[in-house]
């Protein structure tokens, strides 16, 4: 089995039980997760040797998050100490689910690349996975992601990047964030996403009504994502 490294933010999610609204709830269900943490857990459960990189506060909630990952077999020794939370309200009938993010000034947004020994972390690793969520959280996470990708390439590690567009995290400086992610693509071997992700995260679009309007049929996705692959040189 492969040695895999993932990096991102793990959050505490509070969900009202059943289909209650936040205003109706007097208690909440607790879950820990995040895009890259979920990948780490899934791969660990498949038997891979998985290391998760993040930064969390030094308190009981942070330790509970780490314990949750460890129970699934994820190696957490390289997590820096310093969970933020996202709150999810389940939809009912025609009412959609609602998510409230509380990520401002979270631990990872203040993480420095110097807090992680990437030479040791990537020693013997075969795959490094990160998502488009992490670099757009702050200037610090943008630098952290760039250095992590650079170090992974120096060690001959295959790099994997999930564009993972999130509307609520892309409310300011859209052009700047698109340039940031586009620049990071030079370090990426494998990229996950669809035409919407490419348009929103990379600023990539073609003069095609189906593309711009978001017709994500297999043939449309295949055509445009092949063009994206060629443009950025993905494997």
Regions from the language model: what does each represent?
Residues 169-235:
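Conserved phosphate/ATP/ADP-binding segment of small-molecule kinases
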Residues 38-49:
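Alpha-helix C-terminal capping segments
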Residues 1-21:
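Positively charged, low-complexity intrinsically disordered leader regions
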Residues 143-156, 179-187:
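Catalytic-core regions built around general acid/base machinery
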Residues 50, 76, 159-161, 192:
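Hydrophobic beta-strand scaffold residues
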Residues 49-132:
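Conserved N-terminal subdomain of the carbohydrate kinase-like
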Residues 151-158, 230-235:
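A short helix->loop->beta-strand "cap" motif at the edges of active sites that frequently abuts
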Residues 23-33:
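Short pre-catalytic strand/loop immediately N-terminal to key active-site residues, enriched for Gly-Thr
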């Amino acid at each position: 089995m492969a040695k895999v490294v993932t990096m991102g933010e793990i959050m505490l999610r509070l969900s009202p039980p059943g289909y209650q609204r936040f205003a109706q709830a007097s208690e909440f269900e607790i879950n820990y997760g995040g895009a890259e943490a979920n990948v780490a857990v899934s791969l660990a459960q498949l038997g891979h040797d998985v290391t998760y990189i993040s930064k969390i506060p030094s308190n009981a909630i942070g330790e509970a998050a780490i314990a949750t990952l460890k129970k699934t077999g994820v190696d957490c020794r390289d997590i820096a100490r310093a969970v933020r939370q996202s709150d999810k309200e389940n939809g009912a009938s025609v009412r959609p689910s609602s998510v409230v993010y509380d990520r401002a000034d979270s631990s990872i947004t203040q993480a420095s690349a110097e807090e992680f020994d990437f030479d040791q972390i990537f020693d013997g690793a075969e795959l490094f996975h990160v998502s488009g969520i992490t670099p757009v959280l702050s200037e610090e996470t943008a630098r952290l992601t760039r250095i992590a990708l650079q170090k992974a390439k120096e060690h001959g590690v295959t790099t994997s990047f999930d564009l993972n567009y999130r509307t609520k995290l892309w409310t300011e400086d859209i052009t700047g964030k698109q340039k940031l992610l586009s620049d990071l693509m030079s370090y990426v071997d494998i990229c996950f996403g669809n035409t919407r992700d490419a348009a929103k995260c990379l600023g990539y679009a073609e003069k095609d009504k189906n593309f711009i309007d978001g017709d994500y049929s297999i043939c449309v996705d295949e055509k445009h994502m092949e063009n994206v692959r060629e443009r950025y040189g993905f494997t």
